[in-house]
């Protein structure tokens, strides 16, 4: 398959998710956490006690791409809105073995300078443009939060 979609990762199914990612399958799921930096730890925690937590965490930083955290806000009319609160790019420095979480959006604020070159290049190739923030309306909305 090209994509593996799990509506909500709650327990052992995260092992199938990670297995898919390590074979090059794109994966998407939802899970409960209050910060994108906790996503790898949360996934490892759902794998159970019979895993090497450090090794699993290290591998997740190599296969995860983006983490996105949404917040729920209610407007003055009582309507519920979900807004992007955080976006990060997971990375592994193969020289130092450091796990890196590049915070691209934090508290709704965009930090363009935190977009690593390899992510920037992937997005540029996908959208056929050098300006990865070419959606001016989205950029303005994120900057105004």
Where are the language model's segments positioned?
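NTP-binding/hydrolysis catalytic cores, primarily Walker-type P-loop NTPases
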Residues: 77-145
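Conserved P-loop NTPase nucleotide-binding/switch module
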Residues: 1-63
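H-loop (His-switch) and adjacent beta-strand-loop-beta switch element
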Residues: 70-72
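Short proline/glycine-enriched turn/loop segments at secondary-structure junctions
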Residues: 56-57, 74-76
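Residue-level detector of flexible, active-site-proximal loop/helix-junction positions
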Residues: 34, 74, 91
């Amino acid at each position: 398959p090209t994509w593996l979609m799990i509506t909500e990762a709650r327990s052992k199914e995260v092992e199938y998710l990670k297995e898919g990612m390590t074979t090059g399958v794109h994966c998407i799921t939802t899970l409960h956490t209050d910060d994108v930096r906790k996503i790898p730890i949360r996934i490892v925690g759902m794998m159970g006690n019979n895993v090497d937590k450090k090794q699993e965490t290290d591998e997740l930083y190599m296969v995860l791409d983006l983490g996105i955290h949404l917040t729920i806000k209610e407007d003055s009319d009582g309507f519920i809105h979900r807004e992007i609160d955080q976006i990060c790019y997971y990375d592994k420095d193969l020289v130092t073995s450091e796990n890196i979480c590049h915070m691209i959006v934090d508290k709704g604020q965009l930090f363009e300078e935190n977009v690593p070159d390899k992510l920037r290049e992937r997005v540029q190739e996908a959208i056929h443009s050098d300006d990865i923030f070419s959606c001016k309306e989205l950029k303005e909305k994120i900057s105004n939060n």
